[in-house]
Amino acid sequence: MRVSRSLTIKQMAMVAAVVLVFVFIFCTVLLFHLVQQNRYNTATQLESIARSVREPLSSAILKGDIPEAEAILASIKPAGVVSRADVVLPNQFQALRKSFIPERPVPVMVTRLFELPVQISLGVYSLERPANPQPIAYLVLQADSFRMYKFVMSTLSTLVTIYLLLSLILTVAISWCINRLILHPLRNIARELNAIPAKELVGHQLALPRLHQDDEIGMLVRSYNLNQQLLQRHYEEQNENAMRFPVSDLPNKALLMEMLEQVVARKQTTALMIITCETLRDTAGVLKEAQREILLLTLVEKLKSVLSPRMILAQISGYDFAVIANGVQEPWHAITLGQQVLTIMSERLPIERIQLRPHCSIGVAMFYGDLTAEQLYSRAISAAFTARHKGKNQIQFFDPQQMEAAQKRLTEESDILNALENHQFAIWLQPQVEMTSGKLVSAEVLLRIQQPDGSWDLPDGLIDRIECCGLMVTVGHWVLEESCRLLAAWQERGIMLPLSVNLSALQLMHPNMVADMLELLTRYRIQPGTLILEVTESRRIDDPHAAVAILRPLRNAGVRVALDDFGMGYAGLRQLQHMKSLPIDVLKIDKMFVEGLPGDSSMIAAIIMLAQSLNLQMIAEGVETEAQRDWLAKAGVGIAQGFLFARPLPIEIFEESYLEEK
């Protein structure tokens, strides 16, 4: 931005002028003060010199010895100060004169301003003074005026030089401060105002400068922002009618596009749904206008009832609606919402003795930050057109792959929930034994699902699919409750065998985890020390401190805590400090480290040493050979589980094999 007259130059000139006036006055006052001080010092020196010769001069004058008096005057040491010495009689007759320094011209103005030359007059008395002595003569000493003139000029030049430099520094410093504290913020404000796009002029808000919260610039910015807010409110009131659909008062297409522009600017993943209600179109000319309005408003209320507060509902035509589904991150979220919309919209609707069953078509376009508002809208319209041609109550994505992925995701979720409901999930137990004696000390609970052929297994990726479907907390709670139910049944029979249950990070960090777990312990009356929760270390725990806050009350309630799959993730070297803070009792060594035994033992030896230093009980997983068992037993690991001892077993077989005697 260019200006014709710089405020910086003007304020520097003003500051410089003020400073120069100040310097002139100050230099003048100081110069007169210094000259007066020098005059006083010179007069003192002259008086001292005069007193040193007054007595001998008095004796010579009384004796009338003129040569001796002249010799005494000649003996005065001028010291560069005295220019002339005179002996003047009381009748003003000049008896003697002695010049030491030739008189040099001094400007008359300097002589008048500073009262030059400086001279003193000292009375000369007889050696024997009467009661009221009268001087017999006066010794008059005169200072060198030229020397005083040089002092005046030297002092003046020094003062002017120093204070001009100070004035320059002061001018620059003050100007810099004014420039930084006033001009820079004003320039920034001017640049920001000039850079505002035309479409953002109304309602634009200036950022309040950090150092100007409560001064005039801050007041200016606040006043501007307040005026902009008032203008924006007035502008919105004027344009509200033009941005709303008449009957439903929903945002129309113009306002929808503005909202989509904001969504695109934020680059936040969302979905745009176009809902075409064919019933509204088909009733044109059949229902009265008032009836069609009632139908429209009823459908709008139904739509609002299934949308979350974050979502935006708009009406883009007489029978088309649009939903900006904020919060929808995945296609399956969108298809779930679409199914809810279809369900509620297709409910039977009586309109003044006419029974209607509305039907709709829904088109969905996902936004991942790579489209413009127009492209996103066009995709959703295209998907809605395709859905309408497929038949009634159809949902169609613009991208067929998204449709397929969403349907697959919903199918998986439905399959898992159906498996839970139809008792197709079961818990199996794998013994954990003392390696030296083979004695059973505890068992680990493992999840199994019934296969189509009737067998039970844990398919690869099932746990990951459960997590992706958001059902880990549901399935995990089922496993915990089944385990507590089994423990309660055992304990009624006097069997106090501990059970270890895996706990995922999603379960651990769930807000209701502690309350739900304590409720299970109370309901099934689980004895302290018989339930062990295995925190799976390879599943990332985002906040170790929160994990401590969750595990500690459970441990206080009698639940033991084990760290599962040790060495596979969470307790890496840079996280050991967090591991030390966890309230854990047992450390489980992952089978990946056990597989290499006895040949590759360096890592597992370090893990064993760490566990021993923390005084933790150790359990080795995946022990399959006698060589592995022997090495682990020799290294100090007392408990193990693996195919060498037993495979996972159904509860009935486990009880027959291990609990019959008990």
UniProtKB/Swiss-Prot annotation:
Residue ranges constituting the HAMP domain according to the UniProt record: 180-236
Catalytic activity, reaction form: 3',3'-c-di-GMP + H2O = 5'-phosphoguanylyl(3'->5')guanosine + H(+)
Record field: transmembrane: 12-32, 158-178
EC nos: 3.1.4.52
Primary residence: membrane
Residue stretches making up the GGDEF domain: 268-400
GO molecular function: cyclic-guanylate-specific phosphodiesterase activity; identical protein binding
Keyword Repressor: no
GO aspect biological process, one term: regulation of single-species biofilm formation
GO terms under cellular component: plasma membrane
Subcellular location per the Swiss-Prot or TrEMBL entry: Cell membrane
Induction: Expressed at 28 degrees Celsius in stationary phase.
PROSITE patterns in alphabetical order: EAL (PS50883), GGDEF (PS50887), HAMP (PS50885)
Membrane topology: Multi-pass membrane protein
Record flagged with keyword Kinase: no
Highest taxon of source: Bacteria
Keywords assigned by UniProt, alphabetized: c-di-GMP, Cell membrane, Hydrolase, Membrane, Transmembrane, Transmembrane helix
UniProt cross-references to Gene3D superfamilies, sorted A to Z: 3.30.70.270, 6.10.340.10, EAL domain (3.20.20.450)
Domain EAL: 409-662
Described function: Phosphodiesterase (PDE) that catalyzes the hydrolysis of cyclic-di-GMP (c-di-GMP) to 5'-pGpG.
Protein name from the UniProt record: Probable cyclic di-GMP phosphodiesterase PdeK
